[in-house]
Amino acid sequence: MRVRYRLLVILGAALMFGCVSSVDQVMKTDQSAVQLRSYQERAFDTADKEQTMRSVIATLQDLSFVLDKADLDLGVVSATKLSGFQLRVTVTVRPRGSSQMLVRANAQQEETAVEDPKPYQDFFIALEKSMFLTAHEVD
């Protein structure tokens, strides 16, 4: 009986102390989330949500993505690229103040979130070009 009681106390203590997170780990997680968000977001100087959504869709298609869903009211576009592996991206467009649109892209390769800044940079470079050409009415 005493052996079981001791074993339960030891297991309970191990579980309790094993779940405690340090302040450093919490801060590290928050910092990496902020850093990841900086890769994933860009603000554009336009108040036209529909045109921004059209540019996002055109950019994804130019990058060989196949559209899964697009919802103007929600400001969400989902697309998939199949080239040896599955890359899924979800882009949200929302107003930022009265004169800007905030575009955020989230990508997943297979089941893992893409944390490398390069794919996001490539997407936003292509989107910036598309937005520029659209603003200057160049086809």
Annotate the PLM regions.
Residues 20-139:
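Ser/Thr-rich, low-complexity intrinsically disordered terminal regions
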Residues 1-9:
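Bacterial N-terminal signal peptides that target proteins for export
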Residues 15-18:
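C-terminal motif of bacterial Sec signal peptides marking the signal peptidase cleavage site
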